UniProtKB/Swiss-Prot annotation:
Alphabetic keyword roster: DNA recombination, DNA-binding, Transcription, Transcription regulation, Translation regulation
Name this polypeptide is given: Integration host factor subunit alpha
Alphabetized Pfam families for the sequence: Bac_DNA_binding
Function: This protein is one of the two subunits of integration host factor, a specific DNA-binding protein that functions in genetic recombination as well as in transcriptional and translational control.
Organism: Chromobacterium violaceum (strain ATCC 12472 / DSM 30191 / JCM 1249 / CCUG 213 / NBRC 12614 / NCIMB 9131 / NCTC 9757 / MK)
Region of interest called Disordered, as start-end residue ranges on this chain: 50-70
Cross-referenced InterPro entries: Hist_DNA-bd (IPR000119), Histone-like_DNA-bd_CS (IPR020816), IHF-like_DNA-bd_dom_sf (IPR010992), IHF_alpha (IPR005684)
Superkingdom of origin organism: Bacteria
Amino acid sequence: MTLTKAELADLLFDQVGLNKREAKDMVESFFEEIRLALESGDSVKLSGFGNFQLRDKPQRPGRNPKTGEEIPITARRVVTFHASQKLKGMVEQYHANKQG
């Protein structure tokens, strides 16, 4: 199962008591703030959840799988996410209890 933005908004509606429009706007604003921070080069640290960071990947050699021809893969900037130890621990604990 995948959790979508629409489902997050529904959860805010059900559990927090926001109306559907407010819940949808809150979810959209949350992700917009993360996007804006990353676009400006800032990291996003969500305590107890994890960190979003930008990482520069240098140019590297690649290969066309059809022809075998070597082609350069251009340098680029990527977004990475690292889950916090707290989040990892909670997920591991949930699965350990579920299996045991």
